[in-house]
Each structure stands twice: as structure tokens, then as C-alpha cells.
A protein has these predicted regions:
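Active-site microenvironment for binding and transforming phosphate-containing groups
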Residues: 1-160
Length: 160
């Protein structure tokens, strides 16, 4: 419906999924930090759009928001193992500190959208790191201790 929109406040290093179905004129939006990504929130939004709007994943267009990148997102070994088990080896790369690995959250997000039926060419990964872009983006990992508090970003999608 033109003019309809969704807003998702409160994400920082976590990403957001933006999903649009131009055929059914439907949108979906979800917060996708490590918990949501591991729980396949993107695929869940695709299924919800199928059920509620009759959307076909092949028609959907998806994008991710800025999020912490694979060069800056260090997680502990047990979490890295869960991601590799869920999405395949390579989502977590060479260990950082002992007992840790680097997590490619965007790769896991893309994998679940492709497995849910979206075409690769209809998925755009923002590839803008919240941790690295200090001038423009808030990063929970980078800024919370430095600022003595917290900050957030909001995501919004609207049919015009």
C-alpha cells in the first residue's frame, strides 16, 4: 500500500534487513544482530511475506543496512562454531585472539536470503562497516565505552 512504512529503531553494529516485493507492493524490515541472524530472521520475514501478502521470493528485492564487518566483529569460538554449523564453514574466518574468530554477519544474512528463494542479483549488501566509519556511523563496540553511554541508529522502509 503506497505510503505504508515500517521503522526499526535501536540497532548499531547489528544490521537490518530491508525486503521489498514490487509485485505485491509489500515491505519487510527486521533487526538482524547475531541472535537474529543465527535464528534466520531474514528467512522468517520472507516466509511471513509469503504467508501474509502472497509474495514470491523470486520477486523480492533485499538489502542490508550498515553493520559491523567481518574485519571488526570478533566473537568467541563457541558462537563461531554455531555460525559455521548453521551457514557453512567460512562464515567465521581465521581466529583473532585465542579462542575467538571473525564473524561475517553479512555473508550469513545473504546465505539465508538465497536459501529462502531470493535471487542473488536481487540482494544488495551494504558493505559499510559501523565500526570503521567513525565519522558517519555509531558503533556499539567502538563508542559505548568512549561516550559513556549508548547510541543507536534507526532503519525505515516505505512504499511510495
Amino acid at each position: 500500500m503506497p505510503g505504508a512504512g515500517l521503522i526499526k529503531p535501536n540497532h548499531a553494529d547489528c544490521g537490518a534487513f530491508f525486503i521489498y516485493d514490487p509485485v505485491k507492493k509489500a515491505v519487510g524490515l527486521a533487526h538482524s544482530g547475531w541472535k537474529g541472524t543465527l535464528g534466520r530472521i531474514g528467512a522468517n520475514v520472507v516466509r511471513l511475506m509469503q504467508r501474509c501478502y502472497g509474495s514470491d521470493p523470486k520477486d523480492m528485492i533485499a538489502s542490508t543496512s550498515p553493520a559491523i564487518c567481518k574485519n571488526c566483529y570478533e566473537v568467541d569460538a563457541p558462537l563461531a562454531e554455531r555460525f559455521d554449523d548453521e551457514f557453512g564453514a567460512g562464515v567465521c574466518t581465521s581466529p583473532g585472539r585465542e579462542g575467538h574468530a571473525w564473524l561475517d554477519l553479512e555473508a550469513a544474512q545473504a546465505i539465508q536470503l538465497i536459501e529462502a528463494g531470493l535471487k542473488c542479483e536481487n540482494i544488495t549488501l551494504m558493505e559499510k562497516c559501523t565500526f570503521e566509519d567513525e565519522e558517519h556511523l555509531f558503533s556499539h563496540r567502538r563508542d559505548t565505552a568512549k561516550l559513556g553511554g549508548t547510541g543507536d541508529m534507526a532503519a525505515y522502509i516505505r512504499i511510495v
